[in-house]
Amino acid sequence: MKRTLGGTSRKRKRTSGFRARMRTPDGRNVIRARRKKGRHRLSV
């Protein structure tokens, strides 16, 4: 039997992708914080 916990890339990108983050001021803060911290991946 297959599990239902697959994870859909479209949903993931839409909610926590780079462009989704840039859309809101708080999302921009997230990107800014991750840049400052030196994260290799800024978003999903």
Curated annotation (Swiss-Prot):
Region named Disordered: 1-44
PROSITE patterns, per database record: RIBOSOMAL_L34
GO biological process: translation
Protein name (record): Large ribosomal subunit protein bL34
Domain of life, per lineage: Bacteria
GO CC terms of this entry: ribonucleoprotein complex; ribosome
Organism: Nostoc punctiforme (strain ATCC 29133 / PCC 73102)
GO MF: structural constituent of ribosome
InterPro entries: Ribosomal_bL34, Ribosomal_bL34_CS
